[in-house]
Design a protein with these regions (language model features):
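Small-residue-biased structural context
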Residues: 1-149
Length: 149
């Protein structure tokens, strides 16, 4: 079972907002650093912070959603015959998979020293996460409105 905060619009939105704020700060920090000298070393450090945030907060949260919240939603779909809910959950899980792949891409680009690929991957991660959060929060709100969440 997922925690109660995941099944409520405002607490879930607050979790997302905190993660989004941290992510945005690391992306902005990375974008300000040049590829030269000490700043290249600093960029690697910022990317390490980014990847740690992604692994320990964002992807851990995604796992919790998949194991708890989404499983509950699929059970609602089975009980209530809501086929659209199954498609919505599949879409959210696909977005989680995209986030995992983007994180791996950023890590690989960091290892080989491709600064622009790192920055592009970080920005794309941020974009996919923003889209995902909006979609998910809308679904939480919808389920609460119909009394199913």
């Amino acid at each position: 079972m997922s925690g109660p905060a995941l099944r409520q619009v405002e607490p879930h939105r607050a979790i997302h907002a905190a993660m989004r704020h941290e992510l945005q700060a690391t992306v902005m920090a990375a974008e300000t650093l040049s590829p030269d000298g000490d700043q290249a070393r600093r960029l690697r450090q910022v990317v390490e912070v980014f990847l740690e945030l992604v692994e320990t907060r964002i992807l851990a949260h995604a796992h919790e959603e998949e194991a708890g919240l989404y499983a509950e939603w699929l059970q609602l779909q089975i009980q209530g015959g809501r086929e659209a809910l199954s498609a919505a959950v599949a879409s959210l899980v696909l977005q989680h998979s995209m986030l995992r792949q983007l994180a791996a891409d950023v890590e690989r680009a960091t290892v080989v020293g491709k600064r622009e690929a790192v920055l592009r991957g970080m920005r794309e991660f941020q974009r996919v996460l923003d889209d995902h959060e909006r979609h998910e929060e809308d679904l939480v709100r919808e389920l609460l409105e119909i009394g199913g969440g």
